[in-house]
Design a protein with these regions (language model features):
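CheY-like receiver
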Residues: 9, 135-210
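Alpha4 helix (beta4-alpha4-beta5 surface) of REC/receiver domains from two-component response regulators
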Residues: 30-31, 75, 89, 100-115, ...
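Helix N-cap/capping motif at the beta->alpha junctions
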Residues: 43-52, 73
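Active-site beta3 strand of CheY-like receiver
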Residues: 57-64
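C-terminal output helix
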Residues: 121-134, 142
Length: 347
C-alpha cells in the first residue's frame, strides 16, 4: 500500500496474475508490483497452470509472457477470450515479452491482448501500461472472428478509403451489452459491443489519480528493486550461455534441429529481456540478433551453426569483460560484424 498525501491507496484491491517461465525475472517483476502496492499476485510458469489459477481465484489483471510450454501466451489468451467456461473473458491482459517484431504485436493484438510491452522493460513502462488498462479501458468486441478489446484506438470516424482494416456491413447485427450480460455463445454473425469496464478504477477509488500512485518517487523506488538485482544478472547470463552451449552442441553434433532450435530461441530471448532490463544493452542486441538467426535458419546446417557460434562467442566476451551499456564504438563494430557475417552465410 502506497500513501499519497493523507490517503491510503488500495492497489491491493486489484488481484494480479503473472505468467512467465523465467523464474528469476518473474520473481523480480513480482517484487516490483509489490513495491507499487499490489498484494495479491498469483504466479504461473505457463498457460495451463495459469488457466487453473484463473478458474480457482478472482483475477483482475494478467501480465503474461509469450514463449512458454506446454501452453504459450497466445494460446492462453485465446482460451481466456473464447472458451465458453472462461471465468472472466474480459480480463485485461498485458503481454510482456521479448518478441518485439511488428508481426508479434499485430498477432497478439488480433488474439485479444489488451496491451503489449517489450522486454527489456523499466518500472516506468510497466506503470504506464497498468495506468492505461485502469484509466482508459476500451469497448470490448465479441464477434465470430474476434473477441477482445476494440483494436481501433482512433477517435475519428471510420474511413473506408483510408486502408484501415475494418470491415463494416450494414446487415451486421450490432448490439450494446454491459459486462454482466455478456455471453460468449452469441449467434452467428452477431457482433456485441460491451461497454467500457471501469471496475478496476472503482476498486482503487474513482477519485484516485494513478499519476499520484505511480509518482516519480514511487516509480524510482520500484526501479531501484531492478537495479539491486543487477548483481545477479551475470550469474543468470552465465547459466543461459551454458544452456545455449548445450543446445548448440546437439544442433551441431547430433542434428537434433527442432528441439535445439526451440531451446536456443528461448535462451536468446531470455538473455535479450534480462540483459536490457539490467542495462547490458549490447548483450541484449546480440541476443536479439541471435534469435533472428535461429528462427530464420535459411542456409546450410554447418554455416548456420557457425553463425550461431559467433554470436555466442560475442556474448562470452561481454560476460567475461562485464561490458554494460552499448559497448561504445566496440559494440557498434561488433553488431555490424555479426550482421555482415549473417548476410554472408545465410539467405
Amino acid at each position: 500500500m502506497i500513501k499519497v498525501g493523507s490517503k491510503n491507496v488500495q492497489l491491493s484491491n486489484i488481484s494480479v496474475m503473472l505468467i512467465d517461465p523465467d523464474k528469476e525475472l518473474s520473481t523480480l517483476i513480482r517484487s516490483v508490483l509489490k513495491s507499487l502496492g499490489f498484494s495479491t499476485i498469483h504466479v504461473a510458469r505457463d498457460g495451463t497452470a495459469a488457466l487453473n489459477i484463473l478458474h480457482a481465484h478472482n483475477v483482475d489483471l494478467i501480465i503474461t509472457d509469450w514463449m512458454m510450454s506446454p501452453m504459450d501466451g497466445i494460446n492462453f489468451v485465446q482460451k481466456v477470450r473464447r472458451d465458453k467456461d472462461s471465468p472472466n473473458p474480459m480480463v485485461p491482459v498485458i503481454m510482456l515479452t521479448a518478441q518485439a517484431k511488428r508481426w508479434n504485436v499485430e498477432y497478439a493484438r488480433d488474439t485479444g491482448m489488451t496491451e503489449f510491452m517489450v522486454k527489456p522493460f523499466t518500472a516506468k513502462q510497466l506503470c504506464a501500461k497498468i495506468t492505461r488498462v485502469i484509466e482508459s479501458p476500451r469497448t470490448f468486441i465479441v464477434s465470430p472472428q474476434y473477441i477482445g478489446p476494440d483494436r481501433r484506438r482512433k477517435t475519428e470516424p471510420y474511413d473506408a478509403d483510408s486502408g484501415e482494416r475494418r470491415c463494416v456491413h450494414d446487415e451486421a447485427a450490432i448490439a450494446k451489452y454491459s459486462k454482466d450480460k455478456l455471453h460468449l455463445g452469441q449467434k452467428e454473425h452477431e457482433v456485441f459491443l460491451v461497454d467500457r469496464d471501469f471496475s478496476l478504477k472503482e476498486k482503487i477509488g474513482k477519485s484516485v489519480n494513478l499519476d499520484d500512485i505511480f509518482s516519480e518517487a514511487n516509480v524510482r523506488l520500484a526501479q531501484k528493486i531492478i537495479y539491486e538485482a543487477k548483481g545477479d544478472f551475470l550469474h543468470w547470463f552465465a547459466n543461459d550461455l551454458k544452456q545455449l552451449e548445450e543446445s548448440h552442441h546437439h544442433f551441431t553434433e547430433h542434428h537434433e534441429t527442432q528441439a535445439a532450435k526451440m531451446q536456443m530461441a528461448q535462451a536468446s530471448l531470455r538473455i535479450k529481456g534480462r540483459a536490457g532490463t539490467f542495462g547490458y544493452n549490447l548483450a541484449s542486441q546480440v541476443a536479439d540478433a541471435l534469435h533472428d538467426v535461429i528462427v530464420q535458419l535459411h542456409g546450410e546446417h554447418d554455416k548456420i551453426a557457425q553463425v550461431i557460434r559467433k554470436h555466442m562467442d560475442a556474448m562470452y566476451v561481454i560476460l567475461q569483460q562485464d561490458i554494460a551499456g552499448d559497448g561504445g564504438d566496440i559494440g557498434t563494430a561488433l553488431i555490424a560484424s555479426l550482421g555482415d557475417l549473417t548476410k554472408k552465410y545465410l539467405h
